[in-house]
Amino acid sequence: MRCLPVFIILLLLIPSAPSVDAQPKTEDDVPLASLHDNAKLTLQGLWDKRCCPNLFYCCPDRRK
């Protein structure tokens, strides 16, 4: 029964603990949107390298 008050105090302190979002941003922090854009550009570049100039059906952007 001695542990019960300690357990209750710990439960009360958990919601008041600072969250991850409360930490100040550093110069190394990168927003997730830019990571998504970088991945999209990389995949698009790899897709373009796969396509040959004479195979227009494999490149949706090069259909003309």
Curated annotation (Swiss-Prot):
Keyword terms of this UniProt record: Cleavage on pair of basic residues, Disulfide bond, Secreted, Signal, Toxin
Main location (coarse class): secreted
Post-translational modification: Contains 2 disulfide bonds that can be either 'C1-C3, C2-C4' or 'C1-C4, C2-C3', since these disulfide connectivities have been observed for conotoxins with cysteine framework V (for examples, see AC P0DQQ7 and AC P81755).
One of the record's GO cellular component terms: extracellular region
Protein name: Conotoxin Leo-T1
Signal peptide: 1-22
Domain notes: The cysteine framework is V (CC-CC).
InterPro entries per record: T-conotoxin (IPR031565)
Pfam families cross-referenced by the UniProt entry: Chi-conotoxin (PF16981)
Subcellular locations according to the entry: Secreted
Molecular-function GO terms, alphabetical: toxin activity
Propeptide residues according to the Swiss-Prot or TrEMBL record: 23-48
The keyword tRNA processing is annotated on this UniProt entry: no
Entry comment describing in which tissues the protein is expressed: Expressed by the venom duct.
Species lineage: Eukaryota, Metazoa, Spiralia, Lophotrochozoa, Mollusca
Family statement: Belongs to the conotoxin T superfamily.
